[in-house]
Amino acid sequence: MADDAAQAGDNAEYIKIKVVGQDSNEVHFRVKYGTSMAKLKKSYADRTGVAVNSLRFLFDGRRINDDDTPKTLEMEDDDVIEVYQEQLGGF
């Protein structure tokens, strides 16, 4: 019984986040509440093969900074982060 409580406590430190790209491709992450978003951004960029500095990450319509964490953004389990690729120029 004590093991169940300890395990539930460990799970409470983590959050599941879904990152959705422009092409509707989904990447799921399980991170700690205190993990910096810079780490998640880099991991997403590595998985998709795109340079992290050309990507824009948004949560609830607001841009995510590298020093943000799921805790500072008040994220909950299964929240969605949207990813857009930077566009330059055009008419």
From Swiss-Prot:
InterPro entries: Rad60/SUMO-like_dom, SUMO1_Ubl, Ubiquitin-like_dom, Ubiquitin-like_domsf. The keyword Cytoplasm applies. SMART domains: UBQ (SM00213). It is found in: Cytoplasm; Nucleus; Cytoplasm, Cytoskeleton, Spindle; Chromosome. Residues 13-91 form the Ubiquitin-like domain. It comes from the Eukaryota. GO terms for biological process: embryo development ending in birth or egg hatching; mitotic metaphase chromosome alignment; mitotic sister chromatid separation; multicellular organismal locomotion; muscle cell cellular homeostasis; negative regulation of DNA-templated transcription; negative regulation of transcription by RNA polymerase II; nematode larval development. Cleavage of precursor form by ulp-1 is necessary for function. There is a cross-link at G90 (Glycyl lysine isopeptide (Gly-Lys) (interchain with K-? in acceptor proteins)). GO terms for molecular function: identical protein binding; protein tag activity; ubiquitin-like protein ligase binding. GO terms for cellular component: centrosome; chromosome; cytoplasm; nucleus; spindle. Disruption phenotype: RNAi-mediated knockdown reduces survival. RNAi-mediated knockdown disrupts tail tip morphogenesis resulting in retention of the pointed larval tail tip in adult males (also known as the Lep phenotype). RNAi-mediated knockdown causes chromosome misalignment and anaphase bridges during the first embryonic mitotic division. RNAi-mediated knockdown results in impaired locomotion in 23% of animals. RNAi-mediated knockdown results in ectopic expression of egl-17 in multiple vulva precursor cells and a moderate increase in phosphorylation of mpk-1. Residues 91 form a propeptide. CDD domains: Ubl_SUMO1. Keywords: Chromosome, Cytoplasm, Cytoskeleton, Developmental protein, Isopeptide bond, Nucleus, Ubl conjugation pathway. Coiled coil: none annotated. Its main location: cytoplasm. Belongs to the ubiquitin family. SUMO subfamily. Covalently attached to tbx-2. Covalently attached to lin-1. Covalently attached to lin-11. Covalently attached to sop-2. Covalently attached to bet-1. Ubiquitin-like protein which can be covalently attached to target lysines as a monomer. Does not seem to be involved in protein degradation and may function as an antagonist of ubiquitin in the degradation process. Plays a role in a number of cellular processes such as nuclear transport, DNA replication and repair, mitosis and signal transduction. Covalent attachment to its substrates requires prior activation by the E1 complex aos-1-uba-2 and linkage to the E2 enzyme ubc-9, and can be promoted by an E3 ligase such as gei-17. This is Small ubiquitin-related modifier. It comes from Caenorhabditis elegans. The gene is smo-1.
